[in-house]
Every structure is written in C-alpha cells, then in structure tokens.
From Swiss-Prot:
Function: May act as a negative regulator of salt tolerance.
UniProt entry tagged with the keyword Protease: no
Location(s) in or outside the cell: Cytoplasm
Keywords, sorted A to Z: Coiled coil, Cytoplasm, Stress response
Chain intervals with Basic residues compositional bias: 70-82, 591-618
InterPro entries per record: NST1
Segments of this protein annotated with the region Disordered: 28-105, 119-155, 202-249, 318-353, 546-574, 589-681, 722-894, 949-990, 1134-1178, 1373-1399
Protein name: Stress response protein NST1
Length: 1399
C-alpha cells in the first residue's frame, strides 16, 4: 500500500478524455497544502527540509511521468509543436530543440519546453546524493525494472501532515485499542465523502496556483516545478493554454475548455468512474488491505486493515486445510494400499504435526505484526541509528540455499515453534521408537530434538540485542531444515525413514546446528527476529520442483496438499506470497526510511527520483486457493515476457523515430487512444481513489483520536477531582481519627492519673491508719506511765505544798510590809511633783497674761494714734468735701453715689448676716478626707467666715479710730533690708476693723489689698488700694528695678486674650526691661515667697515663661494711690523707691494731702493715676495723663505725679457695678471656702478646681448674680496677705482651673529653697506660688495684731478675735481645728490642708 501511495503521490496522474485533451492531478498542490497544515513550531524548524522534500517530489513525479510516457510515445508518432517565434525567446540558444519534450506554462505566462531525456538524466543526478554516503544498498540480481524504493520524509509529511513520531505512536496505539465495530465505521467507504475530498483538493490546487502566481519572480521560478499544468500537443493549444492560465491567475473560474471546464469535467468523470467501477475499487482496496502494505505507511495505520481481515483469513486457511484434508482422505480411501505399522505411526505423527502446524500458522500473523511493531519502536527510539530491513527479491540465479536458511532460521525463533516443541512428548516418542527395532535409529534424532528444544528455550530467554551474532549459524541450520523440508515434501517419506536416510540427515543438521548454537550460548539468534522476512519465491520454486517430480497426474493435488501441510509447519501464509532476503543497513540519516513497496499482479513502471538503488520486487496478492495461485504464477511469467518484449520493441521503435519523424507525426494522433491501456487507466483510477480513501481514513482517525483524547482528559479531570475530593475526605477523616485518638489517649491518661491518685490516697490512708494505731498505742503506754508518775508526783507534791505554804506565808508578810513603805514614799513624791507643775503653769500663765496685757496696751496705744490720725484725715476730707460741694459740679452724682454705696453696703451686710451657708455649708463627716491633695502640699487652714452686721457695728468705732491714726503713722514696708527685723504693720492683719457703720466710705487700710502680688509679678511693696499710702524703705527698694508696663483691659475672656497675653507689653522676655532680683533680702510680702513646684501638675505647660498671664497686671504705680482718693503726697522719690519709675512732676514742693473722697481741685494740677483713665504720661517710659472724670482729683499744688499702670481690677470696676475692697476680701475668702469644700468632697482635678464650678459656687454663696467672670478673676489676681491664688491656663491662654491656698504657711515638703538662689525664669512653676516660701521664716516671728490669735501655723482670721472667749479662743475656730484638746487646752499645733470645714 505504501508503494502505491508513493507512486501515486509522486507522479502526475493523467487521464485522457477525447482528442487532444489531457488533464493531470499533481500532488504538488496537495503537498503544499499539507505543508501549510504543519504547526508553526514545526514549520519553522523544517522549512529547508520541506523545500528539499518538495523538490524530491517534483523529481519523482517527472521521472515517473517520463518513464511511463516515453515508453508509450516511442510507439506513436507525435507532431512537432509549432510555436510562433515572434513571441518566444530561447534561454539556451545553443541547445537543440528536444524531440521528446514537455511543453509547460510558467506562472508568468511563459512557455517552457523541456526535454524528457534531460529530465531523466537530471533526476538521476539529484541533490540526494548525500544518502549514498550514509546508506548501503545491494544491487538487485533479477530485473533492472524492479527496484526497491523508500518513502522519504516528504511522502511522510504529505500523507500525515504534521504528525510527529510521538503523535504517530499515539495514533497507532489508539487504533489498536479500538474495537472491530469502531474500526469498521472508520474505514467505511462513502461516495459523498470521497467526492467531497476530490472537490476540496481541486479547489485547493487552484488556490495554490493563484497564490504562487502572486508571489515574487524568484519564487515563481521555483514554484513552476511544483505546480504542473496540463501538456498540450500543438502550438495553438499551448498558446491557448498560456492565455487561459493568465486568465485563471486573475480569477478562480474560467469558461474556456482548458480551465473553466476542467474542474467540472474532472468531477463528472470521477463521479462516473466511481459509479461504474465502485465494486472494482472496493475489491482493489480489499486486495491491498494486507499487513505489509499498511506497515509500509508511516506508523499510524499499522495493523489497521490487517486486524479487520485477520479473522477472515484465519477462517479461509482453516477452510483450505479442511478441503485439502478431505480431498487427501478421499483419494487415499479410493485407492487403498496396505500399510505397515510403521507407516501408520508415521501418518499418525504426521497428522499431529499438521494439526500443530495449523495452530502455528494461525498465530504467525500476530507474531509478524508484533515483530513489525518492535522494529518500528526501535527505529523511533534510535532515529540516528536505524536498523532498516530491505526485502530483496532474489534473482533466478541466486542461491536458493541461503534464502531457505534465512527462512528456516527465522522460523526457529518463532514462539509457536517454541510452544510446539514444548508440547511434544519427546520421551514418549523415544519409548515408542525403542519398542520398534526398526526405528532404533530415530532415538538419536529424538535426542537431538530434545537438545533443539533446550536451544530454543535459551533463544527465547536470551537478550535480543546479542543475537546478531547468530547470522553465522544460518548456513548450518538452513542445511538442516532444507533437508527436512525436502524430506517432508517427498512422496517416499516412509521409505526414507525406514532406510535410515532421515536419521542421517537430521543427525547431521541437528548436530552442526546445536554445536554452533551452543558455542554462542544461545544468544546469537534473537537478533534475527528483528529481520524476519518471507521467502515466497524460494518456496514456490520448491513447490514447482516437487510438482514436476511427481509423474502421476492423479496424485498432483495430494502432493500439493502434502507439501503445503508440511510447509505450514514452518511457514505461515505470508511466506506463500513472498520470497525475501534480509539485509540490515545502518543509516545515519534519521529521516531516511526504507519501505518495501508491493506491486500488484498487473505490471507497471515506477521510477523514483532518488539516486538510491532501491530494489522493487513483485508482490503477489493472496489467492483464494492454490489453483488460483498457480494460475497467477503462469500469468506473472507471461506478463514478464510481455514486458520484456514490449521493452525491446520500444528500443527498436526509438531507433526508428529518428528516421521516420514525419511519419510519426501523422500516425501518432490516431494511435494515442488505442495505445493507452484501459487496464492501466483503471489502475491509476484505483490508486487515485485509494489515496482519497487513505486521506479520509486519516481524517476520521484523527477526529476519533481527538474525541477520545477529549473524553480521556475530561475523564481524567473528573478522576482528579474525585481523587482530590477523596484525598480531602481522607485527610478530614484522618484528622478526626487523630482527634479521637488524642481524646482517647487523654482520657486514658486521666484514668491512669485518677487510678494513681486513688492508689496513692489508699496507701496514704493505710499509712495514716497505721500511724494512728501506733500513736494510740504509744499514747496508751505514755498515759499509763504518766498516770504512774502522776501518782508519785502527787504524793511528793502534797509534801512540797505543805512546805511551800509555810514558806509563802512567811514571804507574804514580808512583802506586805515592803509595799506599804513604797506606797507611802511614792505618794509623797507625786504630791511634790504636782505642786511643782502647778507652780510652773501658774508662772507661765502669769507670764502670758503679762505679755498679752503688754501687747494689748501697745495695740491700744497704736490704735489710739491711728484713730487720731484718722480723725485728722477725716476732718481734711470733710473740708475738701464741703469745698467740693460748693463747686456744684457733681452734687447730684455724689449723692447718688453715696446712696448706692450705702445700699450696697447694707445689702452686703444683710447678705453676710442672713446667709446660713457660710456657717453650715457642706459639713462633711468626721472621717472624710480630701481625695486629691493640693499641689503645694500646704496645710489647709480655716476659711474666713463672713462677719455679721452686729459684730461689725460693735467694732466700727474702734476701727474708725484706728483709721484716723493709721493715716498719721508711717506704714511699715513689706520689703525690708536684710539687716532689719520684720515688722509688719498692724493693719496688714486687721480684718475685723475694716467696716464702719457710720461712714459711707471704705477704710483705707484694706489688708487684703496691700502687697499686690499678681501671679508671677515682681516683688513690690505693699500697696493700700484705697488710700494709696505705701511707705518704702529707700535703701532696699532702690535695688529693685521693674520695667513698667501698660496693660489696657486685658481679659482672657475676650477674643484676643491670647494676643494680649503674648503682646510685647506683657511678655517678660519681649519687653526691653526684664525683672531681676538684685539682692537677697528677705521680704515680708507675698512677693518674697518663692515656691518651686516639683509635684506633678497637668498644668505645668502653662508655667512656660513665654505664656503670659492674661490677668497679670502690674500693681498701681503709686504704692500709696487710692482709687477713691488719688491725691496723696509722698516724696518725690516715692515712685522710684517702690521699684517702679515715678512720673515726672511739675513741682517738687509737697503739699498736704486731700482726704476728701471727691478730691479738691488745686491750682497746680499734676498727673495722677486714675482707675478709669488709662492714658498715662511718663518721662521714664510710662504715659502720664491729666486726671479727669469723676474720681480724678488733685491733692495739692506740689503733689508729685504718679505713674499709673492699671491693676486687674481697674478695668472692671465701673460706676455701674463697682466692687469695694470689702467685696474683694469677701470674694477671696468665699473662694477659699469653696475650694476647701470641693477638696473635701473630692471634686478637684489634680489638686486644682475647675474655674466655672468654683465661680458658680462663689456666686451662689454670695448671692451676687451680677458678678462677672472677669470681676471674679480680677479679685483672685489682687494681692492678698492671707490667700494665694494660682490660675491655670490652656494652650490658648484661657483660664481653666484655680488653686487657692493659705499664704505664709511653713512648708513641710519639699523644703524651701535658699533665698539667695535666683530661680531660673524658664523653670518658674505655678505663678501664684512663685514667692510663697521666701518669707515663711520671717512670718514666723511676726507680731500678731489685735483681734487675732496666731494658733500654730494658722494665719490670723476674721473670727479668731482675741477679745472673744477669754482672749485665747477665736470667735469661730479655724477649719479643722478644735478649741480644746483632750486635756482642755487649745489645739495650737494642728494646721494644714485636709481638715474638716467645721468642728
């Protein structure tokens, strides 16, 4: 089949339909079409190979065409072509015009004339000469016209497109795995499918021509050999063909008879042929359905048709054997002959051998297919070293013995032979031979057969690669089996056996064969299994000689049957058809394949375009019976003789062509149709249809394989998913099992532990019980011993007791006498000590009374002096008032103001007298304590309670006298030199003498308003806000410098409070003058106390010196300035002595002070500070202004001008809602009480009270709804001798928290820093405690004024008047202090924060 495909694909298939109409179907288009179907990955790597393969295909096609047409055209006369020389040009003008020529048309329309002989010669010298170096070929010895050809890679690609070796192997395995029904469906021949294949191929051929014509000129010249056009006999037909092809290049269809009608004619002709010769084609296809034909295909169709026909062939052989057997049995029964016992045994053994031969014959085809598979797999696995089998047809003069040897040796390796030898009972045959004395010689033969069986066993078990050495043993074995075959075919076999001839022949052959086989250990013959061949010609010659040797004609069929039966023992059905010789060639070219093509019984010429020396051999198809085979042999010989005769005639006609050229032209046209054999035409048609059938089968096989592959992949995916799911379930199950095992293990461990615990408990109990019993036993013994000892001791004790009683009685009497004496002595001593203590206490009490009386006398004296001064001042004020009234400028305003002041004073007195909250507010339990200690860690002192109206009226007279005397006496400065002893003024501790029931003005000695120390302001002298008198020690105050500042209505509640607080006028580090401490003198004011807070406070960020206090304002520039009466005459240097630059005055003369509240107008006006006037004019950097307004008055002509910096209260005290000094002190005391209440109730936040909560409580207690937050903060910022107010700011400069504490209270922890260490301004902590510790030591030695009791660390207050409760008990004891202790004395040592509000 491969041979037919090779011839059909590589040759131009020609059909002649009528006169001068030739068409051909070239395989070049199909080749190119198939080459385009190769995948891109393979086409890139094999591009050059495809060009070589297409060139090979063209050479093969033209050579085959030349061989077939030259033989036919030598017998006919052809006309010379008449081509117009006007339109033609010659490429080679020197060359002669060829007599045997082919006229073609190039894609560009040029006419090409080629010589057939040149083509033939050129094709024999083709580019495939490189294969001569790599392959060896042996010349044929029978016929020059029968050559063996190989299918190269181009044919391989044309048939199977892009199928690689792996794909071919997979398709082959897929074909073998199909069942018979599926295979029948795939190879089923359908007319529509075949005709569709023809039409598609024709269209593809035309498209290929069009694409090749559009390509470039070099490609056109190369492709003109690929696309073969129909040849024409005349010049006119050639010209028409030129024009038609030019038209065909532009369009796919043409109406001319050469192009347009060609496709339809071909299709109609093919369809007609298919309808008329369908059965013939089917028969032909069935004829070529043989294993060797299909094996010649490139691997994929291996075993395809053979497996379909295998069962039919087996049945056919069995039927033939039955017919032969019946015929032989009938012939023997017709002419019976007496047979001896030996002949019967021989016949019986022959029958057994024949039956075994049938089974061997049935299995040979399968074995051959298996060997072919092995050879193909070996060739695929080793592409560089292919062991290729060339089946060579032996010539008539060849060595028949060598062919028979190869055949018989190959049969020796047959597994069926091995099975037959294994099934033979040689021992039993030996016994039977021994029993017959005539067959004693057969015993040796059977022994040799036993050795042969062992050898065959070794051969089948040996390695196949090592059996190539066995070729040298072919001759010996061939001799043995050839003799055996001759004996089996002979008619006188019983006589030969009886005479011992069989013994000699078999023993010689077996002995030589066994010796050669044993020398190689049985490993030298298996290599021949890969080179199994069939030797049909040799066996046919043997059969012919056997038939000729048989003279009786009636025994002809019997002898033929016997020869076939005997031959079937060693030869299968394929050996009847072929006679081959085995040649192994090592080929280095991996793409060079050697295939053995089979010729049909009809002779034909087929020449390949290779320079290889391939041997073509005849292939005789399978016959229905032996008579058909003999007839075929006779026909074959006749065909060969006819072929030789025809070849000789062709040579003679070639010689005559040169002489009678004109005659040939005239006679050739009429003899063309008659010369083409109808049989050859049908043969070509068969081949053409066979190619389409193969392509159809290939397409079906690939589609089935793809479908099967898709199903397998789908199934594999499903299996993988199921496997994955199962694995997942197994993992989960495994996890569950592991968990269960772990639980079980844990449970067992717990059980073991529990059992161990119980066991230990039982052991412990047993031990305890044993110990208890032992203890009880010991106790019983001890008890017994103790009882005995007790009885002895009791007796002894009784004796001792009696003796002891006697001694004790004597001793008691002695002790009683001694005690009496000691009691009397102690009583006398105690009485003496009591008397001495009483005397000491009496002396101390007398001393205290004397000191108190002395102090009282001094205080009375001072009060009288003060009262005198106040009266004088009052007279001056009264005179000034009368003078002011005479001016009639502000009569109505003064009356209204006096009335308002009186009303406010009465309201305030009534509110203080009638407010029970001051006495009974928030009385905590005795065990309550503050939850949050204060930041300063100072002892909590009792708050100042509001005095009743009655108490104020009782003491007003005394206070009035003290005011008068106070104006006359110089006030003691709070700032003293280091050498001076602290001597505070009496008025600095007076709280009960600040109210006057008969006067409408405030006292000028407000102790709470002296010493203004606002936040972190520099140390200044004490200032009386009401009268402005501030005597200053010059030698101390001159050393204190302070840059005067001008603050105008600074308030944290305004929208620009942050800007105001950070303005240049108030920033301590931005202003030109920074306050510094220049001396280390201890001061008696608040400014002297320096406190460095080391405790945690959430408001430490506000102590940054860059952040100015919004409420911090400089004190009054004139320390003696009075907001009500601004005309006070101090010295020229009074302003400078207080550390503040004094304003420039117009006169240096002093004048008397004007004590009038309204002030008297002096002729010489000087600038005075005004509470409501903020415009100041100062030559020292301060602004001094002329006083104007209601409260501005000039004290005298020569009164010095004072620099005025507005205090915190000055911006808020207006005529609409004024705040008096009494209100300021009351607000400060109430604020302290509210702070203590919040502290005791645990409502403080980090030791400080929220501002709004404290403000609301103060406003509620004082019943002052009109009190604003600015007024409250200004009251807190005014310096006080009793309290210290510390304001806490947020990041925006707003006050959020307030801390209140007593002033002048000794610190407990940490100790105060030394007075001579200057604190770093960047590390100043809470401003209100900045000067709290410097004067603590000086305050300890300060004198206590009248009306106060300095009990321990508690400062003097409003309600601890010395005149109340024997002069030693305050009117209301301080917070947390009791008037008496357990012994009845005053509790003078209990002070500090954390005390209860009231006792």
């Amino acid at each position: 089949m491969s041979d037919i495909m090779d011839r059909v694909d590589n040759s131009t298939r020609k059909f002649k339909l009528g006169d001068n109409i030739h068409f051909e179907i070239s395989s070049s288009a199909n080749t190119q079409g198939n080459s385009h179907q190769i995948p891109r990955k393979q086409s890139q790597s094999t591009n050059s190979n495809h060009q070589e393969q297409s060139q090979q295909a063209r050479n093969q096609s033209s050579q085959s065409n030349t061989n077939t047409t030259s033989r036919k055209k030598r017998k006919k006369h052809k006309k010379k072509s008449k081509i117009s020389t006007v339109q033609a040009h010659l490429n080679n003008p020197e060359d002669d015009y060829p007599t045997s020529r082919v006229i073609k048309q190039a894609p560009n329309g040029d006419v090409i004339v080629e010589s057939l002989e040149d083509e033939d010669e050129n094709h024999h010298h083709h580019e495939y000469e490189e294969h001569e170096d790599s392959c060896e070929y042996h010349p044929s010895s029978k016929s020059n016209t029968r050559k063996n050809s190989s299918v190269n890679e181009s044919t391989h690609n044309k048939i199977w497109d892009s199928a690689s070796i792996e794909e071919q192997q997979r398709l082959k395995e897929f074909w073998e795995s199909l069942d018979e029904s599926k295979k029948l469906d795939l190879v089923k021949i359908d007319k529509d499918s075949i005709m569709r294949m023809f039409k598609n191929e024709t269209r593809h051929h035309l498209q290929q021509q069009l694409s090749s014509s559009v390509s470039s000129q070099p490609q056109q010249q190369q492709s003109q050999q690929n696309v073969s056009t129909s040849s024409n006999n005349g010049s006119s037909s050639g010209i028409n063909n030129n024009s038609n092809n030019n038209n065909g290049n532009n369009t796919n269809s043409c109406a001319c008879k050469y192009c347009g009608r060609r496709n339809s004619i071909i299709e109609e002709e093919l369809e007609s042929i298919y309808d008329n010769h369908f059965d013939d084609i089917i028969d032909f296809i069935h004829e070529v359905r043989d294993i060797n034909d299909l094996n010649a295909l490139p691997g994929l169709l291996f075993g395809g048709f053979h497996m379909l026909e295998e069962e039919r062939r087996l049945q056919k052989r069995q039927q033939k054997y039955k017919e032969k057997w019946n015929h032989s049995h009938h012939s023997t029964s017709v002419s019976p002959q007496p047979e001896s016992q030996d002949n019967k045994q021989l016949k019986k053994s022959q029958d057994q051998n024949e039956m075994k031969a049938i089974s061997i014959e049935d299995e040979m085809d399968k074995f051959k297919s298996h060997l072919a598979k092995m050879s193909i797999s070996n060739s695929q696995s080793n592409p560089n070293q292919l062991s290729e089998i060339h089946l060579q047809l032996k010539s008539e003069d060849g060595n028949l013995t060598g062919t028979t040897e190869s055949q018989l040796f190959n049969k020796l390796l047959d597994p069926k032979l091995f099975e037959a030898l294994e099934n033979m009972d040689l021992d039993k045959m030996k016994e039977m031979s021994k029993m017959d004395p005539k067959n004693l010689n057969n015993v040796n033969i059977l022994e040799k057969a036993t050795s042969l069986r062992e050898i065959v066993r070794d051969l089948n078990n040996a390695d196949r690669s090592s059996l190539q050495k066995g070729i040298s043993h072919v001759s010996n074995m061939g001799k043995f089996f050839s003799n055996l075959a001759t004996l089996n075919n002979a008619q006188n076999l019983p006589e030969i056996v009886a005479s011992g001839g069989l013994d000699d022949q078999l023993s010689k052959g077996l002995s030589s064969f066994a010796e050669d086989l044993l020398k190689n250990d049985g490993n030298s013959f298996i290599g021949m299994m890969e080179a199994l061949s069939e030797s049909r010609t040799a066996r046919e010659e043997l059969l012919k000689e056997t038939v000729i040797s048989q003279n009786p004609q009636e025994q002809k069929s019997v002898s033929i049957g016997q020869s076939d039966q005997s031959g079937d023992v060693w030869v299968d059905d394929d050996d009847e058809n072929n006679r081959v010789d085995v040649e192994i060639h090592a080929c280095d070219n991996p793409h060079h394949h050697h295939h053995h093509h089979q010729h049909s019984n009809k002779q034909h010429d087929h020449h390949h375009c290779h320079n290889h020396r391939h041997r073509h051999r005849r292939r005789f198809e399978e016959l229905d019976d032996e008579h058909d085979q003999e007839n075929e042999d006779e026909e074959l010989e006749d065909d060969e003789e006819d072929y030789y005769d025809e070849y000789d005639d062709d040579e003679e006609e070639d010689e005559e062509e040169d002489e009678d050229d004109d005659d040939i032209e005239e006679e050739g046209a009429s003899d063309t149709e008659s010369e083409i054999s109808e049989e050859e035409k049908m043969q070509e048609i068969r081949r053409l249809f066979l190619i389409q059938v193969i392509k159809l089968f290939q397409e079906r096989l690939k589609n089935a394989y793809k479908e099967k592959l898709s199903q397998d992949r789908t199934q594999k995916l499903i299996e993988e998913l199921e496997a994955e799911e199962n694995a997942k379930k197994e993992r989960e199950l495994k996890k569950l099992k592991q968990k269960e095992k772990a639980k079980e293990k844990k449970r067992l461990q717990q059980l073991a532990k529990e059992e161990e615990r119980k066991r230990k408990e039982e052991e412990l109990k047993a031990k305890e019980e044993e110990q208890r019993l032992q203890k009880e036993k010991l106790k019983a013994e001890q008890k017994k011993r103790k009882e005995e000892a007790r009885l002895k001791k009791e007796e002894e004790k009784k004796k001792k007791i009696e003796e002891q009683k006697r001694k004790e009685e004597e001793h008691r009497k002695k002790v009683e006498a001694q005690q009496k004496r000691e009691a009397e002595a102690k009583k006398l001593k105690e009485e003496r000590r009591r008397k001495a203590e009483e005397e000491r206490k009496q002396k101390e009490e007398e001393k205290k009374q004397k000191e108190l009386l002395k102090k009282q006398k001094e205080e009375e004296k001072r009060q009288k002096e003060l009262l005198r001064k106040q009266r004088e001042e009052e007279k001056e004020k009264e005179a000034a008032r009368l003078e002011e009234e005479r001016t009639k400028l502000m009569v109505n305003d003064d009356d209204e103001l006096a009335r308002q002041i009186e009303v406010e004073k009465s309201k305030l007195s009534a509110a203080v007298a009638n407010n029970p909250l001051l006495n009974h507010l928030y009385q905590p339990s005795p065990g309550s304590a503050p939850t949050t200690p204060s930041t300063a860690n100072l002892p909590a002192l009792s708050p100042l309670q509001s005095a009743s109206a009655k108490l104020m009226s009782q003491q007003f007279e005394q206070q009035h006298l003290q005011q008068v005397s106070q104006e006359k006496l110089p006030q003691t400065s709070n700032i003293q030199s280091p050498n001076q002893q602290p001597h505070p003024s009496i008025s600095s501790f007076q709280f009960s003498s600040e109210y006057n029931s008969n006067a409408s003005v405030f006292h000028n000695n407000s102790s709470l308003l002296s010493n203004p120390s606002i936040m972190n302001s520099p140390r200044t002298t004490s200032t009386n806000l009401l009268n402005g008198n501030s005597p200053i020690v010059p030698n101390v105050t001159t050393n204190i410098s302070l840059g005067a500042t001008n603050t105008s209505n600074l308030s944290p509640w305004s929208s620009k409070s942050r800007l105001n607080s950070l303005s240049n006028s108030t920033q301590p580090f931005i202003g030109g003058n920074q306050f510094t401490q220049t001396n280390t003198a201890s001061f008696n004011g608040v400014g002297n106390a320096v406190q460095q807070s080391g405790n945690f406070s959430p408001f430490n960020a506000f102590s940054d010196p860059l952040v100015s206090d919004a409420f911090k304002a400089a004190g009054p520039a004139g320390m003696n300035s009075n907001i009500w009466l601004n005309s006070s005459n101090v010295g020229n240097n009074s302003g400078n002595q207080s550390g503040i630059s004094a304003p420039t005055t117009t006169s240096t003369n002093t004048s008397s002070r004007n004590n009038s509240i309204w002030g008297n107008t002096n002729p010489n006006k000087v600038t005075e500070p005004s509470l409501l006037n903020n415009n100041n004019n100062n030559n020292n950097g301060l602004i001094s202004v002329e006083s104007s307004g209601l409260w501005n008055s000039n004290g005298g002509n020569n009164q010095p001008a004072r620099s005025s910096s507005v205090t915190g209260i000055s911006s808020n005290l207006s005529t609409i809602n004024p705040i008096s000094s009494m209100d300021i002190e009351l607000i400060q005391s109430t604020t302290f009480n509210c702070f203590q209440i919040l502290q005791n109730s645990g409502q403080l936040e980090f030791g400080v009270a929220p501002l709004m909560k404290l403000f609301q409580n103060v406003k509620t207690i004082l019943n002052k709804p009109s009190l604003t937050i600015n007024q409250f903060l200004n009251c807190c910022t005014i310096n006080s001798n009793v309290y210290i107010f510390s304001l806490k700011y947020d990041d925006f400069g707003n006050v959020t928290h307030v801390e209140v504490a007593y002033k002048n209270v000794p610190r407990t922890s940490p100790p105060p820093p030394p007075g001579n260490i200057v604190q770093n301004q960047h590390q100043v902590s809470s401003p209100s405690f900045a000067a709290a510790t410097a004067s603590s030591s000086s305050l300890a030695t300060s004198n206590v004024p009248l009306g106060f009791i300095n009990s321990g660390g508690s400062p003097t207050g409003l309600f601890n008047d010395i005149n109340i409760n024997h002069g030693g008990t305050s009117f209301l004891p301080p917070i947390g202090e009791s008037s008496t202790n357990d012994a009845g004395s005053s509790n003078v040592g209990n002070s500090g924060f954390g005390r209860r509000l009231w006792n």
